[in-house]
């Protein structure tokens, strides 16, 4: 009897029939079939993944039968011989634990604590019994009632789903509640960010007697008042959802925001006729404004159907899933756990695990006896502090499902624990039953640790050790192996279950990133269900009590460290020892920055202590004065240079590690140091960046020794804080900052801020010194500031939107979203969870039963924000998936595309001009990416030179490109045809409509919603509800001069919170693009004004606005059609095909300009006048086969010497001569960047000494393209490649 027949026979005894689900998976060139078999009431899912359907079914049945054997429902002897049934490895010390739903008595690991089926205490409302179903009404179903009450007045984007409690009325209600219950607790404020970018975190915890527990809220704001109001709002909304307080019953007051002047929009009669035909063809309902009477002060009337309601087609959704657990099985024959598929061919397809284990044992014994190199590494490993505890650690792991190991960085826990487990299994003849996942918080640590462990085992990667990170994997053998991976990669793998895994090691659990906290909830439920799975949690030396308690008071093992003493110096010590005084120039620049940031400060009276002015009397007056001159907000490169000179004077060998908060500062400091005479000398100093996005070959350099007499200076983010260990560090310089993501739910503000790191962070960084000898730590904050720092930063789960995590919860079949998150180590506020659920319903990712729709399932598998994923789906429908993929990658990558030279605060004109007349950071990025890709294909050297010339961040370009390719691959795997992903070349020189680019920019409004702003003047813009903000200085649209744009509307990617909010990654969009894709509400207000989302006013015929609004639900239906049958999008039914055509017409930038005269605008790269720089630049020319000084003048933005891409819009040369009329430009005469090859007329370098493309160069010349000669006396000075290529590889980008 075959295994499938056997399973049917077994199920027939209980009158149950197995249910099979088979689907294709994998890319087209490696097509496989995934079969899942379910047998109720068991929630375990048997899986087979093979190259044909028959084998997939057979293997799925075998997997399920193996499960039945493990839980004791079947005896091994009863199973047919060909089934190969096995309960797993011989180490099953806790036999008999069954899957929830099995008939046997399940053994609970966490006695007396909540298990997988129980709702966490944090979300149990008043009068709730603890089960899951009892609070469905209070959490979701009364939301629609609240929405119906005041739909027209819900100007707060979320008020209607939270009992109409808003930022304006919540604080008063909270005060009443506190007085009634005699609560005297008050807000605790924590300053976030440096002085000029100050914001505040407000936290308040109140004990709620009715619930017998404490409810906490943490929210941020630009000042204390704003933060406290947001905090009160979160608390009141939580109390509402917990049935403690009532909904708001008063009248919501509409704030008197700045009223925007209606913007005129008019369409051609031909286009209006096309819209009418589509409406008729799809039978779309249209609101008739002529039947509507608007009172002068009355509320506006909706012109479209409410998109937030679930339509009737979704009412019959999938059956609501019960809370479940990720399926797990120990290593078993014929299964490759790393690829989550069956082994269909080759020797391993038929070899038993016991036979493999014997081979592994013989091999290891032989190596220990005969391999001298292996024995040397063993001796080294025996000297690590953790080696003394090897036996104790292994005993604890074997005897307990969960163990916490706490130890100093460098004690050896990251590299040794997994090896101890694997070697112990191998030596006992069970090596094939050990498959170990080790998670790391970052890709660089996963790769570097894997390489280190493989080296210690004298193996190549891919033998017993491998790694898997985004974009790159080297998998080990299927049995008896260790895989290092990021937490995100492991979470992605969980969709297929965790079959074939014996141990999961989670490193750096103290970092509390959102993925790690998410994984802990999953592992806690898995261990409670499968006690044979072993989980090891590893942490640095911080308090692990919370983690131990969460896992049922699991054992905690302390590993002693091995470090030399580290002497710490604070800012006042450093200034005194270096005798540092800030230069007049740096003081002037500081004042400029402070004046600019005060432009839109929300609270000009918010006084905050400048701790640089707090200095003890024991320091000299000169030191105190110098400290007071330094801003806490900025990193003084002058001070860093003085400190490095001081270290140099000590003549103490050892590497220097500098902690910086982000790539932009790393790059700027690297360029600064390379341009100094001392630190730019590569014979004395090697300056290396350490960042997760740089190429692997460059990452490795930080670990490599340098020649004698050379000092290694490593510029790193907090990646070097705990994730990696660099042995030769003696000096640590700590800027004391970190980059943090902040989220305020009531106004949907996600922002990024550079904040003060916590004391725990600083202690970890200090510990990186002193690995090989006594060390030194230079902490660049005052002692007073250090004392004021928080002990720990807020966990990321409290400051990030939850809808991405919610999608993953549903994809992994973990039950309801709020149920799962209620079991987190520190559950996020219940109001944030509800908002995530409601948002996913509105996006049609969830059906009426809160289960994934086809769209939701697709978006859950895309590693980008769900709105961006939805944008990509429509991009595929409109045939521009390639452009949408690169835009989505750019919006998901928060590193800068362009680099700025020292002292340069805005982009150069030649960088701004990459967007042409499109006024778009996204277009500039696309053009730069396409140019970069062409150079990359010519070789690494040409790529590096090109990036240096254009001022591009080469690492960012690589990441964006890799992410784009991954997104397109995932779309293909989902079934979307390749024809919709054809590459589209963007030519920024074209002044006019580009239909493909126009529809792509329109779709950005959908992907980045609600991030719409309106330009007012200079840098000032208005965002949602007319809140003032600034254009970010790194935007191509930023200028400190008077500029106007063809349209004032912009879509932006992210917000940076300072005293004002700055908008980054901006693209100009047309009014029709905003109405069609950048809105949720279209209303008719008084005086026939059409109002979008309660703040954008348009002068457009109301009937026409209603017709355009009628297309929006049709577009939602089109997305549903595309996700149901992706392969059919090239053969849409005629009505939908006509819809696509008319939407493309509406997205053309000029579509709303019929009969209207609009200003063409004065764009930022065109705004400089000749008088600004003393006349136009000279026409470009060649000199002895090389460019003259200005060449393409990367540093020349024309401010001082004129230049730029032609002050009168001459672009790249009016006569089409490539990148400039004279000299052949970009390959005019078959010669690279010059006339006869290479980068000059006769292949000659970049000026005589390779000195870059000009220091103060004037861009592309005035009207004819040219190369602009700007300032001959500076020829050859500074910048670019120093002395050929000796400025260090990283100077190239």
UniProtKB/Swiss-Prot annotation:
Species of origin: Drosophila melanogaster
Protein name: Dosage compensation regulator mle
Outcome recorded upon mutating residue 4 to E: Slightly decreased binding to roX2 non-conding RNA, leading to decreased localization to male X chromosome
InterPro entries hit by this protein: DEAD-box_helicase_OB_fold, DEAD/DEAH_box_helicase_dom, DHX9_DEXHc, DHX9_DSRM_1, DHX9_DSRM_2, DNA/RNA_helicase_DEAH_CS, dsRBD_dom, HA2_WH
UniProt KW Nucleotide-binding keyword: yes
Predominant place of localization: nucleus
Region (9 X 7 AA tandem repeats of G-G-G-Y-G-N-N): 1202-1263
Protein EC: 3.6.4.13
Presence of keyword Hydrolase: yes
Subcellular location: Nucleus; Chromosome
